[in-house]
Regions:
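Hydrophobic residues within beta-strands of alpha/beta enzymes
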Residues: 184, 354-356, 451, 483
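Short, compositionally biased low-complexity segments
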Residues: 3-7, 133-146, 243-245, 350-356
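Short acidic/polar active-site loop segments enriched in Thr and Asp
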Residues: 113, 182, 351-352, 449
Length: 560
């Protein structure tokens, strides 16, 4: 075992001891041992126990730990303390800029136990409420986490979007200098609006393909590391694989189609369309006797059968949205005031209404609203509605679903809201039976309007709790409860793979940004993308209702 590995184990032990507030003298002894071992000019693994005890600065107790590590590959003290520390907390120790003291606050005061939850808390502006944290620290932590996530080789769609579009623009300018009318499209999972991206595929069609292939290594924005006959591969500065494919224009359409995927869809369509050549993708589908299938639906499900009978859905577009539901303000853990959020929706986004759903009282970590503050917020909403009319703010709440499935307030409080988003935020470690029962009880509450982020997942960070999707969706259908598509790029929950079943059962979906600041409303674009992927039409989307329609909907939902 190398000195650095031994030192790393001692360093981890000292950090964990500090995290668990053990004796400061013992912590310092272990930390100093890590420094000492790391700087030794010889390999400590070649020494006997007696020789290790003679090393200045170690002593018998530390030497015994070193010897145990060399003989067994571990230390009892380290294993014992690891057993009492969540894995996610240990992972946090690797984040530059936060040490054990801050992690202890994150863990014990905020109830955050892994990096994914920490990243989400940064996005919700929750860290600045904790002792010793400011806005600058929060932003620095967020950037470090984003870098760490990137190192895994998988990226959120939203995190790859800017790079994809900027590279496309630069590449098009570069290509136009070679020929006047090049063809250029992004293919692959990005074109299909997949929530997770592992590579970006650019497909070029050119009348002078050989010349493009010859000159492409000089394209300054991409330092290519590999090249085959017509494929160039590079890595972005943050680790996203980028592939550029070059074809003659005559081969562009079929290769764009193949590289867009998915494999099952491509195979099904080409078995009907034949070998081509094809001038564009429309011709591929026409030759196959199919209606054109938009890229986001190409997942090898039932889209080919629907295309045969011209029964593909008329997919929702962003412009169909008339309002934004499930948002937060400074009343709980938002960055902007209620009025700022409303004016932004009205004047910048040209929406007709805003649903304000600050956190409920159990969400103490998010400054959740008690009964008195609910009354005060409703007074402010009444005043703003008079000021901003005909724009309307609906009185909502994101009510925690408690461990037994009940909501966070009495019926007397719940009936004061125009609508209620019911969400799970605590006790996430559940098996499928417990999670499903908990959700269904909340769904059956007559005051529940929308089921918020149904699985609690954080993409690339935290798996959602397991649920029986069929039972949960059936319960929503039976109780006339809307299911949220949480549009935050970290969530995109309800998963698009279950949209079709929900829509078949007559369940409305709602594209909700869960915005905690004005910029957060932009996430509705991602919700629309994922809704399209699931087959969502505007008529099946709650916040595509006009102000009159949604007012009637909420009024009809109310218990008399």
């Amino acid at each position: 075992m190398e000195n650095k590995s031994i030192a790393r184990s001692f360093r981890l032990l000292s950090q964990l001891m500090e995290l668990h507030t053990e004796n400061s003298f013992k912590i310092k002894t272990v930390a100093n041992a890590a420094l000492k071992i790391d700087k030794l000019p010889f390999s400590i693994s070649s020494k006997t126990l007696e020789e290790i005890e003679q090393i200045e600065g170690l002593g018998k107790s530390t030497s015994a730990k070193v010897w145990e590590l060399l003989q067994t590959g571990t230390m009892t003290d380290l294993q014992n303390i690891l057993a009492n520390t969540p894995d996610g907390i240990v992972d946090m120790l690797g984040i530059k800029g936060i040490g054990p003291k801050k992690i202890l606050i994150i863990w014990k005061d905020l109830g955050i136990e892994n990096i994914g939850e920490l990243y989400y808390a940064c996005n919700e502006n929750r860290l600045i409420e904790a002792k010793g944290f400011g806005l600058k620290t929060q932003e620095e932590i967020k950037k470090v986490i984003e870098f760490k996530m990137a190192a895994e080789g998988k990226f959120l769609f939203a995190h790859s979007e800017h790079l994809a579009e900027s590279l496309k623009a630069e590449l098009l300018i570069w290509l136009t200098a070679i020929e006047p009318a090049p063809l250029l499209t992004i293919a692959g999972a990005f074109r299909r609006y997949c929530e997770i991206i592992e590579e970006l595929d650019f497909v070029i069609g050119s009348d002078v393909a050989e010349s493009v292939i010859e000159q492409l290594p000089a394209f300054a924005s991409l330092p290519f590391e590999q090249k085959t006959e017509n494929l160039f591969i590079a890595m972005s500065p943050f680790g996203l694989k980028i592939q550029v494919h070059v074809y003659p224009k005559s081969d562009f359409a079929v290769n764009l189609f193949k590289l867009t995927g998915n494999e099952a869809h491509v195979s099904s369509v080409l078995s009907l369309a034949g070998d081509g050549p094809f001038t564009d993708e429309n011709e591929i589908y026409a030759n196959a006797g199919l209606a054109f299938v938009t890229p986001e639906l190409r997942e090898g499900l039932n889209e080919v059968e629907l295309a045969k009978t011209n029964q593909l859905p008329n997919l929702i577009v962003y412009e169909d949205l008339k309002g934004s539901l499930h948002n937060h303000s400074t009343w709980s853990d938002g960055v902007h005031t209620l009025e700022q959020m409303a004016v932004y929706c009205k004047d910048t986004l040209n929406l007709e209404y805003l649903g304000m759903c600050d956190h409920s009282r159990s969400a103490f970590y998010a400054n959740g609203l008690n009964e008195q503050r609910i009354y005060a917020q409703h007074q402010e909403i009444d005043a703003l509605n008079a000021k901003l009319a005909p724009f309307k703010i609906f009185k909502g709440i994101e009510s925690d679903i408690l461990n037994d499935g009940s909501l966070d307030y009495s019926d007397d409080i719940l009936k004061t809201f125009d609508f209620v988003v019911a969400s799970v935020h605590s006790n996430l470690r559940m098996d499928e039976q417990k999670a499903t029962a908990r959700l269904i009880k909340a769904i059956e509450n007559p005051y529940t309007t929308i089921l918020g982020h149904p699985t609690g997942r954080l993409l690339l960070s935290r798996k959602g709790y397991p649920i029986d999707y069929t039972k949960v969706i059936d319960a929503c259908a039976a109780n006339n409860v809307v299911i949220e598509i949480n549009a935050n790029p970290l969530r995109l929950d309800l998963d698009w793979r279950y949209h079709r079943y929900a829509l078949q059962k007559g369940v409305l979906l709602s594209v909700n940004p869960d915005a905690h600041r004005m910029e957060g409303f932009r996430d509705m674009h991602y919700g629309v993308y994922i809704g399209r992927k699931g087959g969502l039409e505007a008529k099946q989307c709650l916040n595509a209702f006009t102000l009159t329609e949604i007012t009637d909907y909420f009024n009809n939902q109310k218990i008399i």
